[in-house]
A protein has these predicted regions:
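Hydrophobic alpha-helical transmembrane and interfacial-helix anchor sites in secondary transporters
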Residues: 46, 102, 136-138
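Hydrophobic core of transmembrane alpha-helices in multi-pass small-molecule transporters
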Residues: 67, 78-103, 119-121
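Intracellular terminal tails of multi-pass secondary transporters
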Residues: 141-205
């Protein structure tokens, strides 16, 4: 969420530094949010249909990297505008996918509630840091802010890759255990009490 908060909170400032007046700069943010909202709906619908979210997260991360690359590179204001557009079009779907993944991969009402609360709390704590990434003296390209966010995106890619590898391995192990009939040794109530540790629980990728 650092890239999302960093760019969102500083978006009017970034656009204003491109030569637009304050009122116009506010209006120029509308296409970003309208497109991002549409993409979130499309990604959410498609991910639910195919029961996978990691491909969309990877696509979103790479879209953000491309956007930040355009922002950092020197060029006309239109290039920076396009870069920020790509960043937000990737950041919002990635954030929604992450929130749902946490809910899908934690079983047990208390565990799921605490897990979601922890993720949202840590995400919102990033606001206090992210709003300081884009300083007025770094205008108009804000290389420092964009570079810091690139680091967070790369870290997100690494974490997502590890998470997919880990959960894929667990799913394969549990599939083998189910094939051996291990789940038949327990009652449905016992399996339910095991939550996401149960051999019948399949992690969402």
């Amino acid at each position: 969420n650092f890239p999302l908060y960093g760019v969102t909170l500083s978006l009017p400032t970034i656009i204003k530094q491109l030569g637009y007046k304050t009122t116009t700069a506010q209006l120029m943010t509308i296409p970003f949010y309208a497109t991002a909202a549409f993409l979130v709906i499309c990604v959410s619908f498609t991910a639910d249909r195919i029961h996978m979210r990691s491909p969309f997260m990877f696509a979103a991360y790479f879209l953000m990297l491309l956007g930040f690359a355009l922002c950092i590179s020197s060029g006309p204001p239109a290039r920076t505008y396009a870069g920020v557009f790509l960043v937000l079009c990737g950041a919002y779907p990635a954030t929604s996918c992450l929130s749902v993944l946490v809910a899908n991969n934690l079983a047990g009402s208390y565990k799921r509630a605490v897990g979601i609360a922890m993720v949202l709390t840590m995400s919102n704590m990033g606001t206090s840091m992210a709003c300081n990434f884009y300083r007025q003296r770094d205008a108009p390209h804000f290389v420092l802010g964009h570079s810091i966010n690139v680091g967070f995106v790369v870290a997100g890619l690494a974490a997502c890759s590890f998470w997919i590898w880990r959960y894929s391995r667990i799913n394969k192990q549990r599939a083998a255990r189910r094939a051996a009939g291990e789940h038949l040794l327990l009652t449905p109530e016992e399996l339910s009490r095991q939550g996401d540790k149960a051999v019948t629980f399949v992690h969402t990728l």
